[in-house]
């Protein structure tokens, strides 16, 4: 039934959305077979399930789309203010139902510990860009809630992120976030010694001065073991323009602790014009096509650099009065109705399915192999699976466009392609590459006049793909 659902959805999607992109004039071999999370043993992919703590999305409206999407993890926000509406009394029932359902679909939740709780004086704000708890009473209450939350979920949740985008708050500094992080991380680790601790959820990847105080204090206190993963966001209209700043961020963190894993903790593009959407990148016009292109470039740009990705987000988000912004953030893979129920999947949902199904942990990045291309506007990364090769390639010159004519590109790469095929990651279509478009010299393959669009496509050996 899962396969029937997926195929029917794909046909419906492309019947209703025009795809303004020239497809190769090559033999069509079939369609990538997508896999549910239950059918994927392991991968680095996560999907955003944010704002359930403030009821801006409805998990139970979108949960039937979660497993078939294929992501192996989902980011949730713990919601101190939603759990503790009366001092000292916790209600985890709302979060229990979500965690249990996600696990039943083989999707592992990771929980961000946030936000503040206004029932306490100095308790911080229960919203994006708000303050952390500061009074003695509120900090003790925070400690108690963190301890209770981790105790309650420790048999089901391994990963714990501490706060979200502290650097956009007007009241949080790098120094006081550092102190807050350390006290919280120590509680998590004391309750659950095998926990995996995620730091920051940093909004601005260029904010090195905000980041360094934490690592200085951790080093001084001999507590660098309290950071396992560094999460960052950093929205850019051209996703490929982010990486120089991300590399500087990595070098800063690795100076203190070289084994910190980097994860894109939240990123995705809107799907509507600027007059409609809110949130990051709202100053540009977007469509469901350019959203799909942008999301693919972020995912494969991260993956090619060994960075895990949490794609933001599964459902459009309905921000309410009193928060950092008001309106619909259209970065969801699922288009919502005004009551937060799901109207339908967007083009980006299918694109993400194709990535999550294909790039699991059996596909190994070959970071030492550098493809040679005849243009500096092209990104390309090489992978191996079962002794065969796979190549991702796209034009990164500009922000994803509504219309873009694929450019003929020459690629030379070391690999093993017994029968090379071309895969469009938006449509999922698999094409045979004509023999005139490639040649082999030893273990070097030269691909000739390969049509490369402004979003990632794949050249792979046919044997490592599952398609119908």
Regions found by a protein language model. Name each.
Residues 1-21:
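Bacterial Sec-dependent N-terminal signal peptides
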Residues 21-73, 85, 100, 104-106, ...:
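N-terminal carbohydrate-binding accessory modules
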Residues 69-228, 237:
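Substrate-binding cleft and catalytic face of glycoside hydrolase catalytic domains
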Residues 174-301, 305-309:
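Noncatalytic carbohydrate-binding groove/subsite architecture in carbohydrate-active enzymes
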Residues 269-353, 366-376:
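Aromatic/acidic polysaccharide-binding cleft in carbohydrate-active enzymes
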Residues 371-416, 456-458:
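Carbohydrate-binding surface patches
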Residues 411-430:
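Solvent-exposed beta-hairpin/edge-strand motifs
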Residues 434-468:
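C-terminal beta-strand-rich structural cap/linker in extracellular carbohydrate-active enzymes
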């Amino acid at each position: 039934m899962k396969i029937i659902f997926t195929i029917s959805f794909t046909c419906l999607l492309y019947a209703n959305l025009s795809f303004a992109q020239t497809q190769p004039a090559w033999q069509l071999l079939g369609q990538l077979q997508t896999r549910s999370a239950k059918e994927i043993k392991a991968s680095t992919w996560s999907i955003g399930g944010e704002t359930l703590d403030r009821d801006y999305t409805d998990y139970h409206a979108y949960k039937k789309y979660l497993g078939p999407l294929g992501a192996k993890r989902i980011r949730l926000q713990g919601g101190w203010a939603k759990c503790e509406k009366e001092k000292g009394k916790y209600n985890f029932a709302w979060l229990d139902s979500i965690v249990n359902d996600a696990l039943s679909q083989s999707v592992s939740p990771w929980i961000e510990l946030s936000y503040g709780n206004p029932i306490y004086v100095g308790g911080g704000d229960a919203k994006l860009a708000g303050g952390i708890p500061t009074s003695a009473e509120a900090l003790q209450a925070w400690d108690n809630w963190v301890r209770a939350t981790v105790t309650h979920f420790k048999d089901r949740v391994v990963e714990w992120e501490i706060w979200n985008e502290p650097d956009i708050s007007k009241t949080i500094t790098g120094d006081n976030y550092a102190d807050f992080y350390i006290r919280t991380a120590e509680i998590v680790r004391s309750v659950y010694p095998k926990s995996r601790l995620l730091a920051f959820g940093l909004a601005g990847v260029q904010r090195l001065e905000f980041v360094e105080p934490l690592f200085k204090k951790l080093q001084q206190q001999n507590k660098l073991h309290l950071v396992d993963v560094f999460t960052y966001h950093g929205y850019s209209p051209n996703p490929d323009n982010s990486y120089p700043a991300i590399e500087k961020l990595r070098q800063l963190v690795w100076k203190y602790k070289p084994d910190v894993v980097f994860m894109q903790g939240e990123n995705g593009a809107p799907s509507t014009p600027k007059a409609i959407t809110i949130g990051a990148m709202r100053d540009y016009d977007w469509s469901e096509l350019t959203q799909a292109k942008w999301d693919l470039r972020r995912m494969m740009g991260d993956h090619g650099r060994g960075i895990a990705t949490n794609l933001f987000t599964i459902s459009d988000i309905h921000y309410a009065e009193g928060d950092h912004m008001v309106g619909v953030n259209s970065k969801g893979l699922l288009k919502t109705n005004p009551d937060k129920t799901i109207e339908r999947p967007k083009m980006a949902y299918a694109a993400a399915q194709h990535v999550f199904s294909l790039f699991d942990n059996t596909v190994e990045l070959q970071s030492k192999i550098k493809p040679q291309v005849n243009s500096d506007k092209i990104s390309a990364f090489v992978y191996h699976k079962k002794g065969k090769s796979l190549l991702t390639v796209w034009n990164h010159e500009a922000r994803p466009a509504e219309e873009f004519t694929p450019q003929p590109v020459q690629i030379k790469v070391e690999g093993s392609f017994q029968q090379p095929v071309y895969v469009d990651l938006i449509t999922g279509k698999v094409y045979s590459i004509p023999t005139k478009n490639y040649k082999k010299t030893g273990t070097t393959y030269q691909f000739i006049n390969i049509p490369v669009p402004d979003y990632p496509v794949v050249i792979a050996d046919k044997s490592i793909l599952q398609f119908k």
